[in-house]
Amino acid sequence: MAASNPPKGSVSSSSIRPVTRKAVRCQREVAWLVTQAAGRLVASTEDVNAPTPSFVLAAALDSVRQLELAEQDASGHLDYQNVMAPDLQTFCHMAKLPAAPNALSDAGYMFTLSGADLIRDIYAYCSELAERHVFNAAEIKPGYAIKLVLRLFLMDGFGTMPA
């Protein structure tokens, strides 16, 4: 008996590959935050190669998750609203970062997430934030979560995290 071939145009489970690149719309501020976070990563390791934005975000997300666990263990919580509330110039002062260029605006920036794991982790983090009602929103957009993760990472790195 001959093996049956699937109909032309059908998709088999072996032909489905995970998405490995995803463009996410963010504020232009995110581009600047990534450069600051990359500088912090390079300064804290002996690797002199410039990390990719996706690598920086993955490291920042890992750091933020550890920070959240530590806060839970201490029966505390992170003050997400105070991390996101200030404008960029005020945030830079709070996080002890150099002043951001004045040319930065709320104009768009496309952040390309690379890697199926990072894409899945960012979307899972969005869901977690929404489930915990962190911002009293039914849905947290990936661009907002990326900005939050980078801000938390940069504030924690200099011991300036609001309680």
Model-predicted regions and their roles:
Residues 2-41, 84-126:
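Short Lys/Arg-rich basic patches
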Residues 12, 20, 27-29, 44-47, ...:
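Serine/threonine-rich low-complexity intrinsically disordered regions
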Residues 44-78, 134-163:
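Short, basic amphipathic alpha-helical segments that act as recognition/interaction helices
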Residues 122-126, 130, 147, 151:
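Mixed-charge, glycine-accented linear interaction segment located at domain edges/termini
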